[in-house]
């Protein structure tokens, strides 16, 4: 199965959470981007992706479909947030892609359309 959509808008969310019964210094913060657009593949229900950013090497999960297959969730290291924001804010078209193979392999990415080389 393949998911491919053109990014038309995005929103940044910075959140903080303190679970019931936790100590005040156990609050956790998160950063995510919600990307929305239009599918490039006929019949694909996925037109949104949530990029979740994780601080440090631990805690990374593989890409997955959520919300009954309508949302692609991709995890990236927090260090990539500035590069991804720059990519989204630059002129040109950006795409989100997800590929789910029968052997269990999952590939997901955010990429830009080819840019002509300067002469």
What is the predicted function of each stretch?
Residues 71-118:
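Short, compact, well-ordered microdomains
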């Amino acid at each position: 199965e393949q998911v491919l959509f053109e990014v038309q808008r995005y929103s940044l969310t910075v959140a903080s959470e303190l679970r019931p019964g936790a100590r005040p210094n156990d609050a956790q913060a998160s950063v995510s981007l919600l990307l929305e657009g239009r599918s490039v593949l006929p019949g694909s229900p996925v037109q949104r992706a949530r990029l979740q950013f994780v601080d440090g090497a631990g805690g990374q999960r593989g890409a997955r479909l959520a919300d009954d297959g309508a949302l692609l969730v991709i995890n990236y290291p927090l260090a990539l947030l500035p590069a991804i924001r720059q990519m989204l804010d630059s002129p040109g078209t950006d795409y989100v892609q997800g590929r789910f193979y029968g052997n269990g392999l999952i590939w997901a990415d955010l990429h830009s359309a080819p840019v002509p080389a300067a002469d």
